[in-house]
Amino acid sequence: MYYIVASDLDGTLLSPQFYLTEYTKKIIKRLVNKGIYFVIATGRHYNEAKEIQKMLNVPVFLITSNGARIYDLNKKLIYSCDIEQKVVKELLQKCLLNHDILIQLYSHNNWYVSNNNYSASSLYVSFSFRSKIFEFKTIIKKKISKIFFTCKNVKKLLCLEKYIISHWGKYVNVSFSFLNCLEIMSKTVSKGNSLQLIANMLGLSIKNCISFGDGMNDKEMLDMSGKGCMMDNSHYLLKKSLPNLEIIGSNKFDSVAMYLNKIYFKK
């Protein structure tokens, strides 16, 4: 049996309309009541992930900002890791010159954006969390957990990814959560490493975990788990990089909850 269940949110556990269905909530509650540990593993900020936790109304672990922050069942922060400030400064100096790319940053409590142009970059519904426009001279002094770049032109993001890896690859972990969203965290930060930490804390092996995801920021978690399942709607690069993983249905059809119901409750 898998004693830990970990799931991404957007494109995975959430519906395409960015909400938890009643069926999904029911299955997760049954799992927790059965003694299974449930982990939400998301690129979203804690201030958004905690709203999902409230909807579930059961104690769950939260891996937020792709692992830059981890919270236990009592909502206590148990791990944090920020990007080196010199890297944040140099990245912003480079990317602020390209006005087609929207720059967004997470600090511990806030969400910052380079401008208010969301027409090209609004990727998902925000759960009661509002952004602020940043100023370069002040933002570079703050502790930043995650930077993400969004753009209509995916080729520009692919070029940016190559540039970041070649110049700052030893300092940062780079991945696409969506086709048009490139995310940057500190080098050791990933959902996989975070799940390993939680498993260790519980006295379990990460091989006792089953995980679900759809983006490249889920790759380490899916690969390290005892069983990784990717969504039918997964990023094409994820399918290419982990060809042996089982592909379940789309997030349109409660596929994570249906899969969990099948393996835990035989229905």
UniProtKB/Swiss-Prot annotation:
Active-site residues, record numbering mapped to chain: 8
The keyword Transferase appears for this protein: no
Cofactor: Mg(2+)
InterPro entries to which the protein is assigned, alphabetical: Cof, HAD-like_sf, HAD-SF_hydro_IIB, HAD_sf
Listed GO MF terms: magnesium ion binding; phosphatase activity
UniProt-listed SUPFAM superfamilies: HAD-like (SSF56784)
Residues given in the record as Mg(2+) binding sites: 8, 10, 214
Keywords from the UniProt entry: Hydrolase, Magnesium, Metal-binding
Name of the protein this chain belongs to: Putative phosphatase bbp_030
Lineage, uppermost ranks: Bacteria, Pseudomonadati, Pseudomonadota, Gammaproteobacteria, Enterobacterales
